[in-house]
Design a protein with these regions (language model features):
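Short, flexible loop segments at the rims of nucleotide/cofactor-binding pockets, characterized by
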Residues: 11-17, 33-39, 53-56, 100-106, ...
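Active-site environment of divalent metal-dependent phosphoester hydrolases
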Residues: 20-21, 42-43, 59-66, 82-85, ...
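Active-site HxH/HxHxD metal-binding segment of metal-dependent hydrolases
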Residues: 16-17, 40-98
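Extended recognition/assembly regions associated with phosphoester-bond processing machinery
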Residues: 100-101, 170, 197-198
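Residue-level marker of motif borders
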Residues: 4, 53-57, 104, 122, ...
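Conserved beta-strand hairpin/beta-sheet module of binuclear metal-dependent hydrolase folds
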Residues: 1-47, 114-130
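Metallo-beta-lactamase
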Residues: 4-8, 32-33, 69-195, ...
Length: 198
């Protein structure tokens, strides 16, 4: 897989659909190499031969499947992810390491999402902007949408790096505006926001 540069410190290996594998963020922080997610399947990691610090966005297999196949110095995970993969240091609050900021990110996609802000310029958010699916609807938890907006507003990075999104980069302010509009469509007595698919 080809490594795609975002800037001089940040690049990524593009995810695949078959087999399903998430994008893998690569961050050069001083002498250390960091990965945001590790993908799934041999093809995803064929050129990752070093030793890495890892932040896992969440526990789904397409983001964590290669954990046992890489040389990992340390891994930062949510409590939910640790429950599933049985390894890593739980990041249940903001953690700052050099120019990196690891942060919990509320999400309707699944419990236990983590983001990674780099140099206050880009923030990896994994699948946290996505919803669950039921019947013909995208299902968002209204409170989690509100909480995610609050977290995103506190970030300094103007750009978000979103897994499974072509080109990865989204403008943070545009995402906040979309989530704010979504939140305004919540029902008065329902904890869910339902959006018709298609």
């Amino acid at each position: 897989m080809k490594e795609i540069a975002i800037n001089e410190k940040i690049s990524y290996l593009e995810g695949t659909e078959n087999p399903l594998s998430a994008d893998i963020g690569i961050i050069r922080e001083g002498d250390a190499l960091w990965l945001y997610d590790v993908g799934s399947g041999e093809r995803a990691i064929s050129q990752l031969t070093g030793s890495y610090h890892v932040v896992l966005s969440h526990f789904h297999q397409d983001h964590t499947g290669n954990m046992g196949k890489l040389h990992i110095k340390e891994a930062f995970v949510s409590d939910e992810t640790k429950h599933h993969i049985k390894m890593g240091t739980v990041a249940d609050r903001d953690i700052y390491i050099g120019n990196l900021h690891i942060f919990p990110l509320p999400s309707s996609h699944c419990k236990g999402c983590l983001g990674l802000e780099v140099d206050e310029t880009y923030a990896f958010v994994g699948d946290a902007l996505y919803s669950k699916f039921r019947d013909d609807y995208y299902i968002f938890n209204a409170q989690l949408v509100k909480d995610a907006i609050a977290v995103l507003k506190k970030l300094k990075a103007p750009y978000l790096l979103v897994s499974h999104f072509k080109g990865l980069v989204r403008c943070r302010d545009e995402v906040i505006a979309e989530l704010t509009e979504l939140y305004q469509h919540r029902g008065k007595n329902s904890p869910e926001i339902k959006v018709k698919r298609g």
